[in-house]
Regions:
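Leu/Val/Ala/Ile-rich N-terminal alpha-helices, chiefly Sec-type signal peptides and the beginnings
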Residues: 1-72, 76
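Preference for long, well-ordered alpha-helical segments
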Residues: 146, 150-190
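Charged linear interaction tracts used for macromolecular binding and regulation
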Residues: 59-160
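Amphipathic, non-membrane alpha-helical segments in soluble helical-bundle scaffolds
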Residues: 13, 17-20, 43-47, 51-55, ...
């Protein structure tokens, strides 16, 4: 037997039932179904994914540094009390590159978020600004994922050569540029 409630039309925006439902949703201070709120939540989610990729790249470099140290930097002995300076420099180079990646990760995690200013929403065109932020976030995630993929392919037995470091720095520069563009977009909202 069919349910008679299935045949009823949904209430329109002029309906009292509709207004009560909207008031209940907004009465808690946040409406999950509005596009701007979804875009704000997506912004945080996307930046956390980009940060995970950067953290994975830095962790891989720290792992490679440990393997390199175990292989080439033996414990001191009477014959060799000091480590080989060339291998020591190469091991420190892993750490320096990982530190540069983590600096970008820190900037990404600490980046400004789009405010929820109810007074100026209509005057600023907030939805368009959130869409522009979404495009910047896509660039951030893609760049971070490419960087993590590049670092994942590094061999474990050798240091970072100049060509690979230049590619890593190129990805870091792209991420820095995307973070700067993101900051410029959000500066409009302040």
């Amino acid at each position: 037997m069919p349910d008679p409630a299935d045949d009823r039309p949904l209430p329109g925006e002029d309906s009292r039932l509709y207004r009560i439902g909207v008031m209940l949703l907004n009465g808690y201070g946040y409406n999950w179904y509005r596009w701007d709120n979804q875009m704000r939540a997506d912004d945080l989610l996307v930046r956390s994914r980009a940060s995970e990729h950067l953290e994975n790249a830095a962790a891989r470099l720290r792992d490679l540094e440990g393997r390199y140290r175990r292989k080439y930097l033996t414990p001191p002995s009477r014959e060799h009390p000091d480590p080989d300076p060339e291998h020591l420099t190469a091991a420190q180079h892993f750490r320096a590159v990982a530190q540069r990646i983590l600096e970008i990760d820190t900037r990404l995690r600490g980046a400004a978020v789009p405010p929820d200013d109810k007074i100026w929403v209509r005057q600023r065109g907030e939805l368009e600004i959130l869409q522009r932020l979404g495009k910047c976030d896509v660039v951030l995630v893609a760049g971070a994922k490419e960087l993590a993929g590049l670092v994942a392919q590094l061999p474990a037995d050798v240091g970072i050569d100049q060509a690979i470091e230049q590619r890593i720095d190129q990805h870091l520069d792209e991420l820095t540029g995307a973070l700067s563009r993101r900051g410029e977009i959000l500066a409009v909202l302040r």
